[in-house]
From Swiss-Prot:
GO cellular component: cytoplasm
Localization: Cytoplasm
Short name of any one Pfam family annotated for the protein: Acetate_kinase
Site (Transition state stabilizer): residue numbering on this chain: 185, 246
EC number: 2.7.2.1
Gene3D superfamilies: 3.30.420.40
Binding-site positions, ATP: 14, 213-217, 287-289, 335-339
Name of the molecule in the record: Acetate kinase
Molecular-function GO term, any one: ATP binding
Species name: Synechococcus sp. (strain JA-3-3Ab)
Subunit architecture: Homodimer.
Highest taxon of the lineage: Bacteria
Length: 403
C-alpha cells in the first residue's frame, strides 16, 4: 500500500514514499526528497534518495512559487528514468503533517473541503506551517485527483491534557474563544512514547515519561500511560523552551513595553520567531552545531546561548516531572536531541538525585534508539530517532483500514 507523505514548512519541505508500512517496525522509505527554498533567493535546492541510499541532486527549480512549483518533483515518482512507481495510481494515500488543528481534531482526519477550510482558518496560529501544508494539499489534489489525503495534526496528541495544564490563567471568556494551550510536536512525542515502551520492554500503559523533542523547534511532553498530560508549547509554537530562532516563554510585560515604545506587531512577531533563541543570543546562528563549534573557539556569546538553552531545558524538565507520579525514562529526540551529545550531557548533569545518570561513553557514541543510562540508574535515558514521516504513513494506513 504505497503512501506518500509531505512535511511542509515555511522554507523547506520533506517528503517520503513508503512502499509498505509495518505498524510496529520503522520502514525505510522507497523514496525521499528534501527541498530547501532558502538555498538561494531565486532557486530551490532539491535532493532525493532511493531505498535509503545516498542523497542525489534533483534538477534545481528556478524561481519556484513555493510548494506549488514542485509538480515536476512529484511527477518524477512515476515518470522518467529510475522512477520508483510505474503509474501514479499505485499511490493509495497521501499523508500531510499539519501543525495546528486547534481543538477540532484529535486524530488523523480525511481531508475534505471542510477540513481544508479549518486548516486555513487556523493558519494565523501557525503561520510558518499551516499555509505550506495547504499548498501541498492543493498541489497533490491537482496531480493525484481522487487519491485520499489525510491530515495528521501535531496538536492532536495533546488535546486530552487536564484542564489545569491546558488553560491559561486569563479571563475564562478567552478560553471559550479557543485561547488555550494546544501543544505541538505531538506526532513525534507519541512516536517516542511508543518506541520507548518497545526499547524498555514494558507496556506503554504503565510508563511515565518525559519526551524531549529538540530541534530548531523544541518542546517537552509529560506522558502518563501513553497520554500527554502536560507540554511546554502552548497556543502557538512560540511558548516554552528556548529554540533555534524562537524566544520561547518570556515575560509578557516585555512585549507590552516594546509595543508602547512604538514597535509594531509585525516587527515583534519577526523578532520573537526569527531573531531570538540561539540566533538572537549568540548573534551567530540558530544551529546548535555552529554554537558548539564556536564555544570550542572561545566565543563568549555562543557559550551564553548554550548555557541559557540548557538552563531553560533543565527547568522545564523539572516542570514536566511535577505532572507525573514518578519518572521511568527521559527521552531525547529531534536534530539536537539525537545528535548533540554535549546537550544531553549538560541536561542530565548532577541529576543523580532524580535517578538520572548517563554513561558518558554511550552518550558520545552516536546512539540511536537505545538506552544511554548507566546500568544501575533507576531512570532510563533514551535516544530515539524522530520518524515523523513513518508515523504519518502509519496513521494514514490505520485510518484507511478503518474506513
Amino acid at each position: 500500500m504505497p503512501i506518500l507523505v509531505l512535511n511542509a514548512g515555511s522554507s523547506s519541505l520533506k517528503s517520503s514514499l513508503f512502499a509498505t508500512v509495518e505498524s510496529t517496525v520503522e520502514t525505510t522509505p522507497l523514496w525521499q526528497a528534501q527541498v530547501d527554498f532558502a538555498y538561494q533567493p531565486d532557486q530551490a535546492l532539491i535532493q532525493v534518495r532511493r531505498q535509503g541510499g545516498p542523497w542525489e541532486p534533483f534538477p534545481a527549480l528556478s524561481s519556484p512559487s513555493g510548494i506549488s512549483g514542485l509538480a515536476s518533483l512529484f511527477q518524477s515518482l512515476w515518470q522518467g528514468e529510475g522512477s520508483p512507481l510505474a503509474t501514479a495510481a499505485e499511490i493509495k494515500a497521501i499523508g500531510h503533517r499539519v501543525v495546528h488543528g486547534g481543538s477540532l481534531y484529535r486524530q488523523p482526519t480525511l481531508i475534505t473541503p471542510e477540513v481544508e477550510q479549518a486548516i486555513e482558518q487556523l493558519s494565523p496560529l501557525a503561520p510558518a506551517h499551516n499555509p505550506p501544508a495547504l499548498e501541498g494539499i492543493r498541489l497533490l489534489r491537482q496531480l493525484l485527483p481522487g487519491i485520499p489525503q489525510v491530515a495528521v495534526f501535531d496538536t492532536a496528541f495533546h488535546q486530552q491534557m487536564p484542564a489545569a495544564a491546558a488553560l491559561y490563567p486569563l479571563p475564562y471568556a478567552w478560553a471559550e474563544q479557543g485561547i488555550r494551550r494546544y501543544g505541538f510536536h505531538g506526532i513525534n512525542h507519541e512516536h517516542c512514547a511508543r518506541r520507548a515502551a518497545e526499547i524498555l520492554g514494558r507496556p506503554l500503559e504503565e510508563l511515565q515519561l518525559i519526551t524531549c523533542h529538540l530541534g530548531n523547534g523544541c518542546s517537552l511532553a509529560a506522558i502518563r500511560g501513553g497520554h500527554s498530560v502536560d507540554t511546554t508549547m502552548g497556543y502557538t509554537p512560540l511558548e516554552g523552551l528556548m529554540m533555534g530562532s524562537r524566544s520561547g516563554s518570556v515575560d509578557p510585560g516585555i512585549l507590552i513595553h516594546q509595543l508602547r515604545r512604538g514597535m509594531d506587531v509585525e516587527e515583534l512577531d519577526r523578532i520573537l520567531n526569527r531573531e531570538s533563541g540561539l540566533q538572537g543570543v549568540s548573534g551567530l546562528s540558530s544551529d546548535m552545531r555552529v554554537i558548539l563549534e564556536a564555544m570550542q573557539a572561545g566565543h563568549a556569546r555562543a557559550e551564553l546561548a548554550f548555557n541559557l538553552f540548557i538552563h531553560r531545558l533543565r527547568s522545564q524538565i523539572g516542570a514536566m516531572l511535577m505532572s507525573l507520579d514518578r519518572l521511568d525514562a527521559l527521552v531525547f529526540s529531534g536534530g539536537i536531541g539525537e545528535n548533540a551529545a554535549p546537550v544531553r550531557a549538560a541536561a542530565c548533569a548532577n541529576l543523580g538525585f532524580l535517578g538520572i545518570q548517563i554513561d558518558p561513553v554511550l552518550n558520545a557514541g552516536s546512539p540511536r534508539n537505545c538506552d544511554i543510562s548507566t546500568s544501575d540508574a533507576p531512570v532510563r535515558v533514551l535516544v530515539i530517532s524522530a520518524q515523523e514521516d513513518w508515523a504519518i504513513a502509519n496513521a494514514c494506513q490505520k485510518l484507511l483500514q478503518e474506513e
